[in-house]
Amino acid sequence: MKITILSGGTGTPKLIQGFKEILPNEDISVIVNTGEDTYIGDIYLSPDIDTVLYTFSDLINDETWYGLKGDTFICHEQLKKFGSDEVLKIGDKDRALKMHKASSLKKGVLMSEIVDIERNSLSIKSKIYPMSNEKVESKVLIEENNEKILLKFHDFWIFRKGNAKVLDIFYENSNYAKAADGVLKAIEESDFVLIGPSNPITSIGPILSISEIKNALKEKLVFAVSPIVGENPVSGPAGTLMNAKGYPVNAIGVYEYYKDIVDVLVLDNSDINKKKDINCEVLYANTIMKTIDDKINLARNILDYYKSR
């Protein structure tokens, strides 16, 4: 069985930890959001790609869900002494990966090629694809002191910690972007596609904003795991961003966002009362993943449901 997972943020990597324990890793492909990618000084930050790389290689710091466990921060601390405004605390080994991306991009190497080099260097058997080799950037329109300001997602979430009145979210350049090499083939060859429990607006939305990818998904069996339980996002700014796009912050809002492509919506057991407003198949499970057993059980529930259809 082959599956393709759409991933961004920190929710989906937790579920990936479950799938990689019960499926041959070479049968898992992941298409990753790059809408938050940005240069910081001389390094290239691709947070969602790096998190997936570290998840598959068992290096992820699963307390912060970015960077490597056990990393040191000598470079970051030295930069701060020099007056650097580096807000995100980047570890030394993690910085090396980001330096590799920056230097490779400046040489004209495609992002899909860079990620594949890094994947192989970390002995990862699963395929990992950036959503596009072209720059698609998530932008957040906020209002501050009666003035509208357009921010990169990194500035909105890292510098401002999401504390702003959000008016809208855009995916800059998505109208012109193409799927990265290997993405469409991975979708076509998979038995089903899984949209992980990530923020629909800025973790999955940029991937779906590329028309080639969304059109390919319309031809496949698609599962989507809700990142919202009850009226609350499990983590991150999903609630604020869904409100800004006009979606209710609950399972119904998640369904409305994905309704053009989703066949099976995976909801937490506590959301059983939402079924009547959702016009697709619904799988109920424990979607709160606190332990590795939780992650494996959710992955297994999804696979078992697929096999029973």
From Swiss-Prot:
It comes from the Archaea. 7,8-didemethyl-8-hydroxy-5-deazariboflavin binds at residues 50, 89. Its EC number is 2.7.8.28. It catalyses: (2S)-lactyl-2-diphospho-5'-guanosine + 7,8-didemethyl-8-hydroxy-5-deazariboflavin = oxidized coenzyme F420-0 + GMP + H(+). Its cofactor is Mg(2+). GO terms for biological process: F420-0 metabolic process. SUPFAM superfamilies: CofD-like. Keywords: Magnesium, Transferase. It holds the Pfam family CofD. Transmembrane segments: none annotated. InterPro entries: CofD (IPR002882), CofD-like_dom_sf (IPR038136), FbiA/CofD (IPR010115). One of its GO terms (molecular function) is magnesium ion binding. Pathway: Cofactor biosynthesis; coenzyme F420 biosynthesis. Belongs to the CofD family. PANTHER family: 2-PHOSPHO-L-LACTATE TRANSFERASE. Homodimer. HAMAP family: CofD (MF_01257). Catalyzes the transfer of the 2-phospholactate moiety from (2S)-lactyl-2-diphospho-5'-guanosine to 7,8-didemethyl-8-hydroxy-5-deazariboflavin (FO) with the formation of oxidized coenzyme F420-0 and GMP. This is 2-phospho-L-lactate transferase. It comes from Methanococcus maripaludis (strain C6 / ATCC BAA-1332).
